[in-house]
């Protein structure tokens, strides 16, 4: 891996592979499905004590594709989503509310 993509470069390249209709439904359900596949690998790790890192990495790539396409469908760049998330987490850290639950903490 010599050439590393930025989030936005990845998103633009991934958009060229998107061939679906009903964008929000397809990408939302696809994201849930791929996240479930990651969870399945973790479940098998708990059961068997072995984790196939490459298989999980490939599934994370699928998760990333769906996140990128969902962001595009909502007219956001991945870098904007990343910045919004870091702003939220930074605010929680400043307020001492990283732990706990709920979006508005």
What residue spans do the PLM features occupy?
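Flexible "arm" and connector segments at domain edges
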Residues: 1-105
């Amino acid at each position: 891996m010599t050439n590393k993509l930025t989030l936005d470069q990845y998103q633009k390249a991934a958009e060229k592979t998107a061939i679906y209709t009903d964008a929000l439904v397809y990408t939302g359900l696809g994201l849930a499905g791929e996240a479930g596949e990651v969870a399945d690998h973790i479940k098998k790790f708990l059961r068997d004590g072995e984790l196939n890192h490459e298989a999980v990495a490939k599934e994370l790539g699928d998760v990333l594709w769906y996140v990128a396409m969902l962001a595009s469908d909502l007219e956001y760049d991945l870098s904007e989503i990343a910045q919004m998330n870091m702003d939220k987490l930074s605010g929680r850290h400043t307020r001492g509310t990283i732990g706990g639950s709920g979006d508005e903490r």
